Amino acid sequence: LGLQNATSPIMEELIAFHDHALMIIFLISSLVLYIISLMLTTKLTHTSTMNAQEIEMIWTILPAVILIMIALPSLRILYMTDEFNKPYLTLKAIGHQWYWSYEYSDYEDLAFDSYITPTYFLEPGEFRLLEVDNRTTLPMEADIRVLISSQDVLHSWAVPALGVKTDAIPGRLNQAMLTSTRPGLYYGQCSEICGSNHSFMPIVLEFIYFQDFEVW
């Protein structure tokens, strides 16, 4: 169990922030448990104390410092996710009940629908409920802009290994940036409950080398 292996700079930053926040939470929890154990096993109580400026300063400043230590890396990643350089390719992903459709508009008018592959059509080594009939092919090590929308209800286009999760909202275009540092297949799913077949909207991205993508 755990996070998927990162294949994009954003996901690497998210994993590092997860470890950073988890370490702070662990230290705080250990300190609280230590103080509770001291209070239960020793006479570390002062019921007659009416005023202690030093202690009040400590438990005011220390939480503020801890929050700043968590907030600064979080804000940095937030701005990174909204940073859009000149994209090499623009892909449009449109959610439907219950499949995805994709459009490549930079090269030619290429569009297709991507449905889940039924279990009885799976080949050996393929994943149940994660395979599709038409994979989305993209070039690796390139900045790719994905425009995400919906044709009917709320959906969410999510690929955990790339650190991407963007809502698909009817009548609105949201955008996300993709960059893969290595070739391969990366799986995702709709991450917004959208009806009875919500669990059957997989996403499969196939990242290949530049020269292979141009041929494709």
Curated annotation (Swiss-Prot):
Q: Where does Cu cation A1 bind?
A: 155, 190, 194, 201
- TM ranges: 9-39, 54-81
| Topology, Mitochondrial matrix side | 40-53
May I have one GO cellular component term? mitochondrial inner membrane
Residues at which Mg(2+) binds: 192
Which residues are involved in binding Cu cation A2? 190, 192, 194, 198
Which top EC class is given? translocase
Q: What is its main location?
A: mitochondrion
The molecular function terms in GO held by this entry are: copper ion binding; cytochrome-c oxidase activity
The family annotation for this protein states:
Belongs to the cytochrome c oxidase subunit 2 family.
> What is this protein's function per UniProt?
Component of the cytochrome c oxidase, the last enzyme in the mitochondrial electron transport chain which drives oxidative phosphorylation. The respiratory chain contains 3 multisubunit complexes succinate dehydrogenase (complex II, CII), ubiquinol-cytochrome c oxidoreductase (cytochrome b-c1 complex, complex III, CIII) and cytochrome c oxidase (complex IV, CIV), that cooperate to transfer electrons derived from NADH and succinate to molecular oxygen, creating an electrochemical gradient over the inner membrane that drives transmembrane transport and the ATP synthase.
What is the protein name for this chain? Cytochrome c oxidase subunit 2
